[in-house]
């Protein structure tokens, strides 16, 4: 097991919502020693990480410097943009019509840094970051598509979420957010022919060769409608016989504009949309969003709220892992475990429905708390589940996961090292299978996870299909361990914080104070007004690290909602891990990733 967690210094113990510039972070001193004390603008935020504005001409040099430090920043966690043109609260920041941010992580330091570059509307060009971090490829494609920012030197700067004939850049502020703002859609014969022509497969457009001097390659479309694609997902395979010479994932079929929706919903009314980004995760998806909003608001929730949130999150983690393990076994060729798993998942849904009133998409977490208190009898239902589930896990292992055929199909298949995982932004079980025990619940505890006793399972140095699935089984056991502690140690107290921005606010006082009634009316009708600032929250979601990066301009709605999902990064890694393997190995690999396309496409 690798444990590189550094002890958090005293200044890290400040409230999560405190606005800080992080000038005392060692990396700021290292950057100033190398590039000069006046080379950067350091932005105070509530993100919890240093935010440094760099000049475009210095971007690659700064990125290379950070990657080669003694304790390097080895992972490009996220990269995206923002339309700054309508933003009013920008005091002290470089003039910008648009900006692009680069979020880097250092495993050795257990610290992050966010680089930002300011751009003017008449010169939207940046050098590509792909030479430093290969996973910048898809992030730059999406940023170009959404904002029109060109990354010079990018190997294949083409649309990634939208159809190839799409016009405009959807995340610009002057781009319509609702269908009613567009002209009526008409599909003429000429337009239909144009659309069909645009969908014609041309290997050169995907960076693929038609063949060698002596033979042509065969091209095969796996998906977008294929049972092993786990959603509307297409992979173009370049084959030499059954060997995969190269492949290109084609995503975007599930894209529904989740980040654009964040700009048109109030801080409160956006919560149901978070459930649908990774639709198996339920309340897990709500956690990073409400925590990020609470940082903006300066809310500290009661202990009871923290434990309730952890309990619901771990129930949904078990629910998601059960589906993953059983469908992985099904992809390899065994059917029975799927039916076993759905029996177990039904028990979880019954428990979740009893607590929240809903099954898959509860939309139950609230800014400052949860929707309502735990119902009578919740402890009995949870206790019965905890008595049932451990024996079922043992049966999964005995019946399927120790099977020699399954192991023969998955051991050593689609294997990658820790270095490769970090280069591609891999998180979750895929990264931990390489031996790095990076679990946000342990390394950067949130919602009181530091008060729970549990282990982080890791692999032995190489992440392959079998190791990934076995880690998930052990993670199930650890989640059961956490749930037992929730059952035994549920605190008493309120289920909402006593704070003016808690939403919806407590209604009891509205019958006594006219000021409270006015506040309640405004928050329920328009939504709460969050202070102008930026906040960020990452969590250990069911499939890896999920995060929300929110920008408030002092309004009832988010100015910019950036959703970073683990599945997006994991699918980009597919070609590097599967080249030289067989098509049958690809099916096993896809089953071992643990993804749903809504988590990829948002």
From Swiss-Prot:
Region (NADH dehydrogenase I subunit D): 216-602
PROSITE patterns: COMPLEX1_30K, COMPLEX1_49K
Alphabetized InterPro entries for the sequence: NADH_DH_suC, NADH_DH_suCD, NADH_Q_OxRdtase_suD, NADH_quin_OxRdtase_su_C/D-like, NADH_UbQ_OxRdtase_30kDa_su, NADH_UbQ_OxRdtase_49kDa_CS, NADH_UbQ_OxRdtase_CS, NDH1_su_D/H
Parts of the chain that traverse the membrane: none
One GO CC term on file: NADH dehydrogenase complex
Keywords, ordered alphabetically: Cell inner membrane, Cell membrane, Membrane, Multifunctional enzyme, NAD, Quinone, Translocase, Transport, Ubiquinone
Subunit structure of this chain's protein: NDH-1 is composed of 13 different subunits. Subunits NuoB, CD, E, F, and G constitute the peripheral sector of the complex.
Function as written in the Swiss-Prot or TrEMBL entry: NDH-1 shuttles electrons from NADH, via FMN and iron-sulfur (Fe-S) centers, to quinones in the respiratory chain. The immediate electron acceptor for the enzyme in this species is believed to be ubiquinone. Couples the redox reaction to proton translocation (for every two electrons transferred, four hydrogen ions are translocated across the cytoplasmic membrane), and thus conserves the redox energy in a proton gradient.
Record family assignment: In the N-terminal section; belongs to the complex I 30 kDa subunit family. In the C-terminal section; belongs to the complex I 49 kDa subunit family.
The protein's name in its UniProt record: NADH-quinone oxidoreductase subunit C/D
């Amino acid at each position: 097991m690798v444990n590189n967690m550094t002890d958090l210094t005293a200044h890290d113990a400040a409230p999560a919502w405190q606005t800080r510039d992080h000038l005392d972070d060692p990396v700021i001193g290292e950057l100033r020693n190398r590039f000069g004390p006046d080379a950067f603008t350091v932005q105070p935020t509530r993100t919890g990480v240093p935010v440094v504005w760099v000049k475009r001409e210095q971007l690659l040099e700064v990125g290379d410097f950070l990657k080669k430090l003694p304790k390097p920043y080895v992972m490009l966690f996220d990269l995206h943009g923002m339309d700054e043109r309508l933003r009013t609260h920008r005091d002290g920041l470089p003039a910008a019509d648009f900006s692009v941010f680069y979020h880097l992580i250092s495993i050795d330091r257990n610290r992050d840094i966010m680089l930002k570059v300011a751009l003017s509307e008449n010169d939207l060009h940046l050098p590509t970051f792909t030479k430093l971090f290969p996973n910048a490829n898809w992030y730059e494609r999406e940023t170009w598509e959404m904002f029109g920012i060109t990354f010079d030197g990018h190997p294949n700067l083409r649309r990634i979420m939208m159809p190839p004939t799409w016009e405009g850049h959807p995340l610009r502020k002057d781009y319509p957010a609702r269908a009613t703002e567009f002209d009526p859609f008409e599909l003429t014969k000429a337009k239909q022919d144009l659309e069909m022509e645009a969908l014609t497969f041309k290997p050169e457009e995907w960076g693929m060769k038609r063949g060698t001097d002596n033979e042509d390659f065969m091209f095969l479309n796996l998906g977008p409608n294929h049972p092993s694609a786990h959603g509307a997902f297409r992979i173009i395979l370049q084959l030499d016989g059954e060997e995969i010479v190269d492949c290109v994932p084609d995503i975007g079929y599930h894209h529904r504009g989740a980040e654009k929706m964040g700009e048109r919903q109030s801080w409160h009314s956006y919560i149901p949309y978070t459930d649908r980004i990774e639709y198996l995760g339920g309340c897990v998806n709500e956690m990073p969003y409400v925590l990020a909003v609470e940082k903006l608001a300066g809310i500290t929730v009661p202990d009871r709220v923290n434990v309730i949130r952890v309990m619901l999150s771990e129930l949904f983690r078990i629910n998601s892992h059960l589906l993953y393990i059983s469908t992985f076994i099904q992809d390899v060729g065994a059917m029975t475990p799927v039916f076993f798993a759905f029996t177990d998942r039904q028990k979880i849904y019954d428990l979740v429905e009893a607590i929240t009133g809903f099954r898959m998409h509860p939309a139950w977490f609230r800014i400052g708390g949860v929707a309502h208190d735990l119902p009578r009898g919740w402890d009995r239902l949870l206790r019965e589940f905890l008595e049932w589930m451990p024996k079922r896990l043992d049966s999964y292992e005995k019946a399927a996961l120790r099977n020699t055929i399954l192991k023969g199909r998955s051991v050593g298949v689609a294997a990658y090292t820790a270095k490769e995982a970090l280069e591609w932004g891999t998180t979750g079980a895929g990264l931990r299978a390489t031996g790095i025990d990076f679990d946000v619940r342990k390394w950067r505890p949130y919602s009181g996870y530091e008060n729970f006793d549990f282990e982080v399972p890791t692999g032995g140095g190489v992440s392959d299909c079998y190791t990934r699935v076995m880690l998930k089984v052990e993670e199930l056991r650890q989640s059961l361990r956490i749930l037992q502690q929730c059952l035994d140690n549920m605190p008493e107290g309120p289920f909402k914080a006593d704070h003016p921005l808690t939403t919806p606010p407590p209604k009891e006082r509205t019958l006594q104070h006219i000021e409270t009634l006015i506040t309640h009316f405004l928050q329920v009708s328009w939504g709460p007004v969050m202070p102008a600032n930026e906040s960020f929250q990452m969590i250990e979601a069911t499939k890896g690290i999920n995060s929300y990066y929110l920008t408030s301009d002092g309004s009832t709605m988010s100015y910019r909602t950036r959703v970073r999902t683990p599945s997006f990064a994991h699918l980009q890694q597919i070609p590097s891990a599967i080249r030289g393997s067989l098509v049958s190995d690809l099916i096993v690999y896809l089953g071992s990733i643990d993804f749903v396309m809504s988590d990829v496409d948002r």
